[in-house]
Every structure is written in C-alpha cells, then in structure tokens.
Curated annotation (Swiss-Prot):
One gap junction consists of a cluster of closely packed pairs of transmembrane channels, the connexons, through which materials of low MW diffuse from one cell to a neighboring cell. Plays an essential role in gap junction communication in the ventricles. The keyword Glycosyltransferase does not apply. Residues 322-379 are annotated as: Disordered. It comes from Xenopus laevis (African clawed frog). GO terms for cellular component: apical plasma membrane; cell junction; connexin complex; intercalated disc; mitochondrion; nucleus; plasma membrane. Keywords: Cell junction, Cell membrane, Disulfide bond, Gap junction, Membrane, Transmembrane, Transmembrane helix. Pfam families: Connexin, Connexin43. Belongs to the connexin family. Alpha-type (group II) subfamily. Its main location: membrane. This is Gap junction alpha-1 protein.
Length: 379
C-alpha cells in the first residue's frame, strides 16, 4: 500500500482546530482504519487473486470469475472510503488556513499602522477596524477554538458530508459483496465452458476483517451524528441566550483616540472639552452630575492653553472685569444624532449650562452700568 504520511500530517493539523468529538473521530480514523489497513488487512488480501482457484483448465476462466465475484478489491474499496471520508475534513482545514493567512495579513497591517501612529499619524479608526476584523477571523481565544460564522458553517457541512459518505460506502459494500465471504463461488460466464466452482483462500479471516471495518464505519458515523447534534445544539443555545454581538463588544472595548478627543464625546461623558465655554475667575459652570473619574486628565494641556489665551485677551482689552465674550458664551452646536437625550441612562441627561455669578460687584461694573449708551431711551 502507498505512503500515508502526507495524509497523516494534514489530518494531524486538523486536531488543533477540531472539537472533542472531531479529535475522537480522527483517532478512530488513524488507529482503526489507516494503521490497520496498512498492516494486517493488506497482508490478508495480498494473495486474493493468485489464490482464487477454479476447477477448470480453460484459459481466462478464473480471471472472469474473479472479476464477477469481486468487482473491486476490499483493500482498494476501503482506501477509497478513507479518501472520500477525509476530503471534507481537508476542505475544513483549507478554510482554517485561509483564515490564518487573513489574520497574518491583518497583523502585518496593524504593525505598520502602529509605526505610523508612533510618528504622530492619526490612524485610530484604521486600528479599530483591524481589531474588529481580527476578532472576526481569529481562530483561538483563551486557548479554545472560536468556531463561529463561516468557519462554523464549514465545519457543520464537513460533518454532513462525512456522514453521507459513510452511509454511502456501507450501502455500496453491502450491494456488491455483502458483509461475509463464502469459501466457494459458482461461476458460469464466457469463456468458461460450463458452470465452474471457484475457491477462495482464508474466507473466515477476511470475513472477520470485513466485520471489523464495518463496525469502525458505524462507530465513525455515530461520532459524526453526535458531533453534529452537539455543534448544532451549542450554536442554538448561544443564540437563545442572546450573547452579546462580537462586533458591538469589540466596538465598546476598542475606543479610538479620535473619538475620545472630540468635543462631542467629552460633552456626553461629562468632561470639559478644549472648545467648551470657559468660566472666568469668579464664575462657576454647572453642567449636572457627572462621573469625575471619567474626566480625569482630559486634555489638560489644551485647557491650560485656552486659559493662557483668555488671559492674553483680557490684557489686550484692558478690562479686568469684562464679561464673557459672545464667542465663549455660544452653546454647543451638535449634530442631530447627539441631541436626543432621551436614550441616555437616567441621571445622565444633558442639563443646560448655567452661569452662577459668585463675584462681588465691582466699581468698574457700577460705573459701567451708569454710563449712558446710544440706544438708551430718554425720559
């Protein structure tokens, strides 16, 4: 028989990406089929045609009678069965290799983007997309196989085809020569001159091997059915439990720096953005109750720069107690999708900014209030 090392190496790689039932099935395939077929079975059928003797001297009669009794050798039939049954598993392995290649490309792209990010480039959104794709194409999670999506469908289809091939080969074997061998075969076929009797060597030994291989096929079929029900039940159970969507989980876990640095993100999380209205000395901004831990260390340098700009502006104006400019007093102009605060959690609704004047009235303000203005009404 040929060398099974190439097929063995390929099937050995499937062990890392199979369930417990799949690993047991591969063990049955290796131990009770490939190894047994390469050692004991081949030696038992080594002389099947040479030891097939008919009681006639007619040339060619033994050959045609052997062809009628055994359309295909049992050994070659079982080799075909192993190849057909292993093909769906190899196709599943090809899908696994495809996903591994996708993951390698994403890793290389992520390294390139991180190098760009270290140089000051803004690639946060691209890194977030790569994280989502890696979650989709990833193969291992906490040491376990992540079998979902297309990979799960491929695995279920491979189990179905393996089961169909097992049933098909069992039916074909029963149709061609049954599950036992007789010691005498009667043949009446040209060029035999009359009905002749042909004798088979070691029929009992060969019958034992036939039954053994039949039992192995039935066990393999049962493992496939059990694994199919288990995988289907597991996927349905996960769907009923309403597991969190992996993409939304990834979106929550991976928040880009661009969004965290935006004024809208800061406002809705209770943080002061660099472009938010500033309160001059003596004033206090009230924005509602927020979580102080989420605002910690938020754009500290930008806030200091804004205060420096504000002080410079006040010095240029020469008015120590001037009111807040209209530029700083303008409300936020958010897009429509952020103005609906009904969807926010209770206790975190947006509250309008209110300015509490806690400073004492100054002389400058009193004099400024008594100065006549052009638009005042005369009494």
């Amino acid at each position: 028989m040929g060398d099974w090392s190439a097929l063995g190496r390929l099937l050995d790689k499937v062990q890392a990406y199979s369930t417990a039932g799949g690993k047991v099935w591969l063990s049955v395939l290796f131990i009770f089929r490939i190894l047994l077929l390469g050692t004991a079975v081949e030696s038992a059928w080594g002389d099947e045609q040479s030891a097939f003797v008919c009681n006639t001297q007619q040339p060619g009669c033994e050959n045609v009678c052997y062809d009628k009794s055994f359309p295909i050798s049992h050994v070659r039939f079982w080799v075909l069965q192993i190849i057909f049954v292993s093909t769906p598993t190899l196709l599943y392995l090809a899908h696994v290799f495809y996903l591994m290649r996708k993951e390698e490309k994403l890793n290389r792209k992520e390294e390139e983007l991180k190098m760009v990010q270290n140089e000051g480039g803004n690639v946060d959104m691209h890194l977030k997309q790569i994280e989502i794709k890696k979650f989709k194409y990833g193969l291992e999670e906490h040491g376990k196989v992540k079998m979902r999506g297309g990979l799960l469908r491929t695995y279920i289809i491979s189990i179905l085809f393996k089961s169909v091939f097992e049933v098909g080969f069992i039916i074909i074997q029963w149709y061609m020569y049954g599950f036992s061998l007789s010691a005498i075969y009667t043949c009446k076929r040209d060029p035999c001159p009359h009905q002749v009797d042909c004798f088979l060597s070691r029929p009992t030994e060969k019958t034992i091997f036939i039954w053994f291989m039949l039992i192995v096929s039935i066990v393999s079929l049962a493992l496939n059915i059990i694994e199919l029900f288990y995988v289907t039940y597991k996927s349905i159970k996960d769907g009923i439990k309403g597991k969190k969507d992996p993409f939304s989980a990834t979106n929550d876990a991976v928040i880009s720096g661009k969004e965290c640095g935006s004024p809208k993100y800061a406002y809705f999380n209770g943080c002061s953005s660099p472009t938010a209205p500033m309160s001059p000395p003596g004033y206090k901004l009230v924005t509602g109750e927020r979580n102080p831990s989420s605002c910690r260390n938020y754009n500290k340098q930008a806030s200091e720069q804004n205060w420096a700009n504000y002080s410079a502006e006040q010095n240029r104006m020469g008015q120590a107690g001037s009111t807040i400019s209209n530029t700083h007093a303008q409300p936020f102009d958010f897009s429509d999708e952020h103005q609906n605060t009904k969807k926010m959690a209770p206790g975190h609704e947006m509250q309008p900014l209110t300015i509490l004047d806690q400073r004492p009235s100054s002389r400058a303000s009193s004099h400024a209030s008594s100065r006549p203005r052009p638009d005042d009404l005369e009494i």
